[in-house]
Amino acid sequence: MDNLIGKTLDGLYTIQELIGAGGMANVYKAVVSAPGGPVPEGTVVAVKVLRQELMHDADLVRRFKNESKAISLLNHPNIVKVYDVSVSENLQYIVMECVEGMTLREYLNERGGKITSRETVHFIAQILRALDHAHRNGVVHRDIKPQNIMLLDNGQLRMMDFGIARISRAENQIQNGKKAMGSVHYISPEQAKGEETDPKSDIYSVGVMMYEMLSGRLPFDADDMVEVARKQIRDLSLIHI
C-alpha cells in the first residue's frame, strides 16, 4: 500500500487515494481537513507529489518547482488551478484543482482517434484561449499533447502538466541546453533540435493535435522516437491530409 494514503500534509491535506502515476510525480486525491488553508475545509483537491526517489535529482526538482511557478502565474477557466505549493517532511508537492473527467487522449481513443470538425474547433478554440493567457503571462508550456488536457463532462477543457514549461520573462529564463524537451510526436522542429522555444512552439503542437483530430493519424510517426523527431525537423513539406 502507498505509504502516503491517510497521511496529512502540513496539517491541511489528507491523502485519500492515488489517482495518477507518472515518471516524475504521483497525483493523489485529497481533502482539505482543517481550516486556515487557501481553500475551504472539506474541499476535494489533487495533490501532485514529486516521487521520493527523485528528490536527489536536481534537474527533476527544478522542473517540478518550475511547474508550480508556471501555474501560479495563471488564472484561466481552461487551465487547472493551483492552490498551494509546499514542502512537507521532505516531500515536494503542489495542491491543485481536482478535475473529474477523462483526458483528451482517452476521448480520442474512444472515437477511433478521429472526431468531427465541429468538435475539433470546439476543443482547439479552448486550447488556444488557454495558451493565449499563458503566453501573455510569459509562460510557454512546451508539452502540449492530448494526454495533458482534461475533458470535463460539460465539454470544457482544462490544460495541465506544466512540468517542462518555460518562464519566458527575461529575469527568469530557464533554458535546457541542447536537450529536446516535450513529447516527440507533438514537439516543434526547434524543440526536436534542442533549440530555444517560444509561444510559436506551443502553437505548432496545437497544429499537430488538430491534424490528428481531423485525420485520425499523427503527421509524423515511426517505431523509433529518434526517427519521429528527425521527421519533425526535415519532413514538414510531406504532410498530407
Q: What is the meaning of each model-derived region?
A:
Residues 85:
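Activation-segment/catalytic-loop signature of the eukaryotic protein kinase fold
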Residues 128-139:
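Protein kinase catalytic-loop region centered on the HRD/HxD motif
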Residues 89-103, 107:
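Conserved short submotifs of the Hanks-type protein kinase catalytic core
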Residues 123-124:
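Activation segment signature within eukaryotic-like protein kinase domains
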